[in-house]
Regions:
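Active-site beta-alpha turn of Rossmann-fold NAD(P)-dependent dehydrogenases/reductases
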Residues: 7, 44-47, 68, 92-94, ...
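Conserved catalytic-core motifs of eukaryotic protein kinase domains, centered on the activation segment
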Residues: 13-20, 54-58, 101-102
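Glycine-rich NAD(P)-binding loop of the Rossmann-fold in SDR/ketoreductase-type enzymes
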Residues: 17-32, 65, 69, 73-74
């Protein structure tokens, strides 16, 4: 059996709104899952690059983590719980973008594009801040890749994404502006989300995984979808 551990409260806003639930679901439920595994079951854990924090530097899997949110803290705690378990791979995913049936609207590329299309204005906080991104279909492909290469990857942690997909907030906003006209306002106020880092994906790329979809392709897809897609925030119900 292969278990894809996707259960959890995901993202800065959702975890900040209910830290107790984030601890119970992201950390304690992971502990229960680990204790329930048989020796023959393989587990692929969905972790996050968010734990690299606000260093502003290039980060690989050996870089000391600096979690700056409840979300990042709980995901790192889950990683540590699984560290000594047999048959486990942890994937530190980039921020996902692109359309899906239950799309998260709080993710940066999805959110920025929605505001450009629907509101015609985007206010940027800490426009210099860098993040790393990955199309949702590439994220799914990464799970399949890891399943197919499990024996080679087990017992380790991998950044999941691509070296060509590190962008600043301002760069994302301008890529959207290349496709649709809207106003970008740079605010002097600080963002509550302090993340700022550049992620290195050499480790997983050397095994053969490289994301195929570009940011530009994702933006084009979202612009088309937002002509009929009704906004829903997944964490309002938490």
């Amino acid at each position: 059996d292969v278990i894809f551990h996707l259960a959890g409260i995901s993202g800065f806003p959702a975890c900040a709104s209910n830290p107790h639930s984030a601890q119970l679901i992201n950390v304690e439920a992971t502990r229960l899952l680990r204790d329930s595994l048989s020796k023959n079951q393989r587990l692929i854990n969905a972790s996050t690059t968010s734990m690299y924090g606000k260093s502003g530097k290039h980060c690989d899997e050996e870089t000391a983590v600096e979690p700056v949110s409840t979300y990042a803290h709980t995901k790192y705690a889950a990683e540590k719980i699984l560290h000594d378990a047999e048959n486990v791979v942890s994937l530190r995913f980039a921020t996902v973008f692109g359309f899906s049936p239950k799309m998260r609207m709080d993710l940066m590329v999805n959110d920025f594009t929605y505001k450009a299309v629907k509101e015609k204005v985007l206010v940027l906080f800490d426009s210099f801040a860098k993040r790393t991104f990955m199309h949702v279909e590439d994220a799914a492909d990464c799970y399949i890749f890891t399943m197919d290469h499990f024996d080679e990857m087990k017992g380790d942690i991998y950044n999941a994404g691509g070296n060509h997909l590190n962008y600043s907030k301002e760069e994302i906003a301008n890529l959207i502006k290349d496709k649709i006209d809207y106003n970008i306002i740079n605010s002097e106020l600080k963002d509550k989300d302090l993340r700022h880092f550049i992620v290195n994906f050499d480790k997983i790329e050397k095994l053969g995984f490289v994301p195929k979809r570009t940011i530009q392709e994702g933006i084009n897809e979202l612009i088309k979808v937002y002509s009929f897609y009704e906004y829903f925030s997944h964490y309002k119900t938490i």
